[in-house]
Regions:
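Residue-level signature of outer-membrane beta-barrel architecture
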Residues: 22, 26-28, 32, 73-77, ...
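Gram-negative outer-membrane beta-barrel transporters
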Residues: 146-149, 166-259
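Outer membrane beta-barrel strand-and-loop segments of large Gram-negative receptors
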Residues: 8, 116, 120, 126, ...
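Repeated loop/turn-to-beta-strand initiation elements of outer-membrane beta-barrel proteins
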Residues: 31-34, 80-83, 137-141, 191-196, ...
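Outer-membrane beta-barrel translocator domains and adjoining extracellular loop/strand segments
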Residues: 46-54, 96-102, 109-110, 153-161, ...
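C-terminal beta-signal and adjacent terminal beta-strands/loops
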Residues: 151, 251-263, 286-346
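Signature of Gram-negative outer-membrane beta-barrel scaffolds
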Residues: 1-78, 104
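Transmembrane beta-strands of outer-membrane beta-barrel pores
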Residues: 40-46, 87-93, 100-102, 133, ...
Length: 346
């Protein structure tokens, strides 16, 4: 990959990823099954560029060798009931533009973004326990609980720079998330709505970032993590007529988009920027004509709800009274996307 304009915003970079995987499937009778494995990865990120002022050469040659174990155990209580437990380790590696030291302008935010050459890989240990119930063909209900522990999670941060803002990236020390999740798929044939099914997914998530002792940072959620999410959909399928359609709803909870700068005096904080909750609704339709032609149509984000980013400024007055001021950072409507297409099979 190569991007070039001037020294201050040009760089040459490459990465090398080598991997090997070993796995085994173990069966203990007809009820208990286990899949265990480990993935070994070698990763090398190289970058040659210049500092943000274009005068000092910068060279990166980051090499890591990692092992990622995974275990998945399932126990069949009966033909329709299953209990599953799983553990796995994963990695989130910085992207090129997150580590290169040059500054580029983001027109949507009206702000500069600069990479961080000190950014490290982020690792996560994931643990999940889930109960699964399959009442009929094509139907399911699952209830699960999960826990994730992060080492060096990558977060986007921002600070005031002159008359505007400047965004960059950093590693928090540690973080953890845990929560519960519900998945359901149910046919509506039982109320006379043949071919129609309801799908729902909902989760509650609690997340917290851990800081060094004595640091000015205060207890807060992990950036990018919503406290809840809801997905629901109606799906229609008529194989004889070649018709399929879906109506999908989505909502996410308030989440941190960019981490601010905490101070010892809370009144001087540069507060976090939050992405506010919004509702979205998508509609899709397709019709097969013969064996070769299919007509497709869709409407994305039918509600065209505002995307809003806000700060919640916490203040303490001279008498020790506390109050919070809400202020809008930016907002816009993404627009409704309507598409129609025809596909041919030869």
């Amino acid at each position: 990959m190569r991007e070039t304009t001037t020294n201050s915003d040009s760089y040459t970079s490459e990465n090398i990823l080598g991997a090997a995987y070993v796995s085994a499937k173990l069966n203990y009778g007809e009820a208990l099954n286990a899949n265990i494995g480990v993935r070994m990865e070698y990763y090398n990120l190289k970058m040659d560029g210049y500092s943000s002022d274009g005068t000092t050469p910068v060279h990166l040659d980051n090499r890591t060798s990692d092992f990622f174990p995974s275990v998945n155990i399932s126990y069949n209580l009966s033909a329709k009931h299953l209990v599953r437990a799983a553990y796995g380790r994963s990695v989130n590696r910085p992207e090129f533009r997150e580590v290169v030291p040059y500054v580029y302008f983001n027109f949507e935010r009206d702000a500069n973004i600069v990479g961080n050459t000190e950014l490290k890989n982020a690792y996560a240990d994931n643990l999940e326990v889930r109960y699964e119930f399959y009442p009929a063909s094509g139907e399911m209900i699952t209830i699960g609980a999960f826990y994730k522990r992060f080492k060096d999670p990558i977060e986007e941060t921002y600070n005031e720079a002159g008359s505007g803002l400047q965004y960059t990236y950093h590693n928090a020390k540690n973080a953890e998330t845990f929560g519960i999740e519900l998945d359901m798929k149910k046919s509506l044939d039982f109320i006379g709505l043949r071919g129609l099914s309801l799908v729902c997914n909902a989760a509650y998530i609690h997340s917290r970032v851990r800081f060094e002792e004595g640091a000015p940072e205060r207890d807060r959620p992990l950036a990018g993590q919503s406290p809840y999410l809801v997905n629901a959909g109606l799906f229609y399928q008529h194989d004889d007529k070649g018709i399929s359609a879906s109506l999908l709803y989505n909502r996410i909870g308030k989440r941190i988009e960019s981490v601010g700068v905490p101070m010892q005096d809370q009144n001087e904080d540069i507060p976090d920027i939050y992405e506010m909750p919004r509702n979205s609704l998508d509609l899709t339709f397709s019709k097969k004509i013969g064996k070769a032609v299919e007509i497709k149509a869709g409407i994305q984000d039918m509600l065209n709800s505002k995307i809003e980013y806000k700060q919640f400024v916490k203040l303490t007055d001279k008498n020790g009274g506390k109050r919070e001021r809400e202020q809008l950072v930016r907002s816009y409507r993404p627009g409704v996307d309507i598409n129609v297409g025809v596909s041919l099979k030869f």
